[in-house]
UniProtKB/Swiss-Prot annotation:
Regulation: Not inhibited by 2-(2-methyl-2-hydroxypropylthio)ethanesulfonate (M-HPC), an achiral analog of both R-HPC and S-HPC.
GO BP term (any one): fatty acid elongation
Pfam families: adh_short_C2
Function: Involved in aliphatic epoxide carboxylation. Catalyzes the reversible oxidation of (2S)-2-hydroxypropyl-coenzyme M (S-HPC) to 2-oxopropyl-coenzyme M (2-KPC). The enzyme is highly specific for the S enantiomers.
Assembly and oligomerization: Homodimer. Component IV of the aliphatic epoxide carboxylation complex together with components I, II and III.
Entry keyword annotation includes Nucleotide-binding: yes
Source organism: Xanthobacter autotrophicus (strain ATCC BAA-1158 / Py2)
InterPro entries per the UniProt record, alphabetical: NAD(P)-bd_dom_sf, Sc_DH/Rdtase_CS, SDR_fam
Up-regulation conditions: By aliphatic and chlorinated alkenes.
Enzyme class: oxidoreductase
Miscellaneous comment as given in the Swiss-Prot or TrEMBL entry: Enantioselectivity is dictated largely by changes in Km.
Residues the entry annotates as binding (S)-2-hydroxypropyl-coenzyme M: S137, Y150, T182, Y209
Protein's recorded name: 2-(S)-hydroxypropyl-CoM dehydrogenase 1
Higher taxonomy: Bacteria, Pseudomonadati, Pseudomonadota, Alphaproteobacteria, Hyphomicrobiales
Gene3D superfamilies for the chain: NAD(P)-binding Rossmann-like Domain
Amino acid sequence: MLDAEVIAITGGAAGIGLAVAHAAIRAGARVALIDRDGACAQRAAAEFGAAAWGVGADVTDEAAITAAMAGAQRALGPLTGLVNNAGIAGFGSVHATEVETWSRIMAVNVTGTFLASKAALFGMLERGRGAIVNFGSVAGLVGIPTMAAYCAAKGAVVNLTRQMAADYSGRGIRVNVVCPGTVAGTDMGRQLLGTDCDPELEARRLAKYPMGRFGTPEDIAEAAVFLLSTKAAFVTGSVLAVDGGMTAI
C-alpha cells in the first residue's frame, strides 16, 4: 500500500503515532519519527532499523520543525506523506480555563499542525504529489463538557484540513483528517479516563460507544495508512471519525 513512500509522523515516538509508524512500515513505507522527546524518537527508530529515522523537535517551534523535516528528507528521501499526530488535551470550561492553558493547547494542536504542514508542503508542491493526514478528535465534531480549549483546537484542525484540501488537491496533494474517539492505552486516553482508571467513569464513557469498546492505537493507525495510500486516491477534504459510532448517536 505504501511501497517506497516516505512518511513523517509528528508525536511519533509513542501511542497512536508509534502505531501509525508500525502500520506504515508494514505497508512498505519508511518513516521519520518526530517527537518532542528526541531520545525516545531515536530509540523507537532504532528498533525499526533502516526503515525509520528519529529526531527531537517541538512542533510549535518553526525553526525546529523545519529542520526536522529537512533532516528526514536527507536521511530517507523526499517526503511523500505527513501525519500530524502531535497533540495535547486539557480540561476546563471557558470560565475556568487559564489563558496560558488555552494558548498552549492551541499552539500544539493548531499551530503545530500548521507549521509541520508548511515545512512538508514545499517539497510536495515541487514534486506535485503528497498526502497529509491531520489528527482531529471527536472533540472537534461535538461539544465535550469541560474541554473548551481542546474542542476549539480540534475543531480548528478539522476546518484547516478542509481549507488545505481546497488549496492543494488540484496540485496533487490530498489532505484528510482522522477524528478518533477515546483510545485506550495512550497518555490521552488515560487522561480522559482518569489516572486511577475509575470504573464508574470508564463505564459512563463506554456507554457512549455503540460498539461497546474504546478504540486502540491500531484502529486509528490503519485509518491513517488508508488515507495515506493510493487506495484513497479520490479522497480529500474528508473527515473520518474512527470512534466506534460515538458521534452517530
